[in-house]
């Protein structure tokens, strides 16, 4: 079964050119990994500076064998350590649902990370997939997927010297949460706005906010 590894890294704001150059080198390195199905790297669209790396592996065996040389977290530490401003977060996930519209070129994207209590996870999964299936009847989306964290493989990596990071990690790795990732891509800003004003999306968004904690990352593909 394919394994999705999502890695989020925050970097200093005034080193964008340096950060982009180093992330491209990391991307070139990852492409050589045995068992890699695909890799996507996004950078933030907001005033903050962060990068979101998505790698898909044929199965978990290939991923575990690639740890030393191709784990995005290790590559980030080796190439960008002085640019990192906070802990690096990494989730091991399984795909639940996906969509791609032929001939639509994704130019902007967003990642919705939702944390819920375990007893809500199955309900969230069913409701979210149903809502997304209704949304793709509209032509706004170019590409999208929904994934769910494998809780037993959760990895939160942080700077041991930073008290805040330690507190965050301790809170995040407990057994009282499940994480979902929904990545959405659009051909342009008009389609993105149309998507977010759709009543089906508003219904999903309201439901997710009522049962969990929602983070939204505004992204540009690299």
Model regions and ranges:
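A short beta-turn/loop motif at secondary-structure boundaries
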Residues: 42-47, 147-152, 172-176
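An amphipathic, aromatic/His-enriched active-site/gating alpha helix that lines ligand/cofactor pockets
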Residues: 28-37, 56-90, 135-142, 157-180, ...
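N-terminal interaction modules that seed assembly of large macromolecular complexes
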Residues: 44-56
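Surface-exposed beta-loop interaction hotspot
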Residues: 77-137
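Active-site-flanking beta-strand signature of metal-NTP-handling nucleotidyl enzymes
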Residues: 2-10, 52-54, 108-115, 181
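Short beta-strand/turn micro-motifs at beta-sheet edges
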Residues: 40-42, 96-103, 167-172
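Short, surface-exposed ligand-recognition loops at beta-strand->loop->(often short) alpha-helix junctions
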Residues: 10-21, 115-125
């Amino acid at each position: 079964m394919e394994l999705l590894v999502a890695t989020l890294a925050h970097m200093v704001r005034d080193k964008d050119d340096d950060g982009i150059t180093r992330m491209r080198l990391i991307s070139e390195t990852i492409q050589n990994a045995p068992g890699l199905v695909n890799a996507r790297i996004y950078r933030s669209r907001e005033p903050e500076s962060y990068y979101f790396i998505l790698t898909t592996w044929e199965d978990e065996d290939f991923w575990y064998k690639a740890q030393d040389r191709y784990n995005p977290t290790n590559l980030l530490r080796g190439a960008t350590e002085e640019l990192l401003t906070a802990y690096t977060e990494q989730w091991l996930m399984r795909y639940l649902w996906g969509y791609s519209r032929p001939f639509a070129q994704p130019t902007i994207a967003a990642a919705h990370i939702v944390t819920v209590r375990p007893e809500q996870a199955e309900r969230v999964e069913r409701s979210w997939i149903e809502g997304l299936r209704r949304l793709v009847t509209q032509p706004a989306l170019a590409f999208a997927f929904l994934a769910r964290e494998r809780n037993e493989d959760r990895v939160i990596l942080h700077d041991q010297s930073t008290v805040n990071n330690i507190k965050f990690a301790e809170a995040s790795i407990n057994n009282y949460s499940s994480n979902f990732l929904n990545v959405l891509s659009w051909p342009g800003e008009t389609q993105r706005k149309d998507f977010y004003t759709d009543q089906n999306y508003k219904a999903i968004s309201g439901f997710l906010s009522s049962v969990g904690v929602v983070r939204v990352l505004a992204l540009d593909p690299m």
